[in-house]
């Protein structure tokens, strides 16, 4: 019985994954056709952005401080004090800021998307939208995809700044590193391409989170229990997709070597 349930869950997961790919194509087609509900889009942008800002920035600040604590002592021991800021900057810009911000948004916003749309599905509210000649993709999905795609890069940029500020505070207060040395290292290591890649990653992650959350919500069945299962699997799938896509994006964007100024 357990094996049968596991096979059913895996089959349902793959079906939802295929549905998510088809939904992605539909969403972009609707956007190109200008079928955008502006009011809903603004509401979702407020949810993804301002309402999620505090937890994202707190996470980034402590990550920057912890990272600095972990590397500063070792770098000072080997006489590499002038590289601490640059290493933190590259780590945050290329990986930590976009990935951790996406993880926070997947947990907070992606789960909300799946739960809200899933509840509408099992209570037949989506059928009511069809009866009112309203396409659920236009009304529910497109605004959420646009909101995540626009707001996640902004949140990531703010998280990057806060994470760097946290690292600067720790390096100067605990390890007596001159802030000028720290900031010069950041400037020498970080290139404009790194910032662009950071924001582009966030855009991709935002679309992934919204598509998976909405797709899992639209395919929810089984009442309240089904909503709970959809919400849980939507978050887990979003995290898995974020990590996998991050690998390929990093491989494509940063596979070159020797592209960082060490002077």
Curated annotation (Swiss-Prot):
InterPro entries to which the protein is assigned, alphabetical: ABC_MlaE_roteobac, Permease_MalE
Predominant cellular place of this UniProt entry's protein: membrane
Assigned GO CC terms: ATP-binding cassette (ABC) transporter complex; plasma membrane
Membrane topology per record: Multi-pass membrane protein
Signal sequence interval, chain numbering: none
Cellular compartments annotated: Cell membrane
Transport is among the record's keywords: yes
GO process annotations (BP): phospholipid transport
Key word Transport present: yes
Entries under Pfam families matching the protein: MlaE
UniProt keywords, alphabetically: Cell membrane, Membrane, Transmembrane, Transmembrane helix, Transport
Chain ranges passing through the membrane: 12-32, 52-72, 97-117, 140-162, 167-186, 192-212, 234-254
Molecular function, one GO term: phospholipid transporter activity
PANTHER family for the chain: ABC TRANSPORTER PERMEASE PROTEIN-RELATED (PTHR30188), PROTEIN TRIGALACTOSYLDIACYLGLYCEROL 1, CHLOROPLASTIC (PTHR30188:SF4)
Role description: Could be part of an ABC transporter complex.
Family: Belongs to the MlaE permease family.
Entry protein name: Probable ABC transporter permease protein slr1045
Species for this entry: Synechocystis sp. (strain ATCC 27184 / PCC 6803 / Kazusa)
């Amino acid at each position: 019985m357990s094996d049968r349930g596991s096979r059913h869950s895996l089959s349902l997961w793959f079906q939802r994954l295929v549905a998510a790919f088809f939904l992605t194509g539909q969403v972009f087609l609707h956007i190109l056709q200008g079928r955008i509900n502006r009011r809903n889009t603004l509401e979702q942008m407020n949810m993804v952005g301002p309402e999620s800002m505090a937890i994202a920035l707190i996470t980034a600040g402590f990550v920057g401080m912890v990272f600095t604590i972990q590397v500063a002592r070792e770098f000072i021991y080997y006489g590499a004090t002038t590289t601490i800021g640059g290493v933190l900057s590259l780590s945050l810009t290329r990986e930590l800021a976009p990935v951790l911000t996406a993880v926070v948004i997947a947990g907070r916003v992606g789960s909300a998307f799946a739960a809200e749309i899933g509840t509408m599905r099992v209570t037949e509210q989506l059928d009511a939208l069809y009866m009112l000649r309203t396409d659920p993709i236009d009304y529910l999905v497109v605004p959420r995809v646009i909101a995540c795609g626009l707001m996640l890069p902004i949140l990531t940029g703010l998280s990057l700044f806060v994470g760097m500020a946290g690292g600067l505070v720790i390096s100067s207060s605990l390890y007596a590193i001159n802030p000028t040395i720290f900031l010069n290292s950041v400037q020498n290591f970080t290139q404009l391409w790194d910032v662009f890649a950071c924001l582009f990653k966030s855009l991709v992650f935002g679309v992934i989170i919204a598509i998976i959350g909405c797709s899992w919500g639209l395919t929810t069945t089984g009442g309240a229990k089904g909503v709970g299962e959809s919400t849980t699997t939507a978050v887990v799938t979003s995290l898995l997709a974020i990590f996998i896509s991050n690998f390929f994006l990093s491989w494509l964007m940063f596979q070159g070597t020797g592209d960082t100024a060490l002077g």
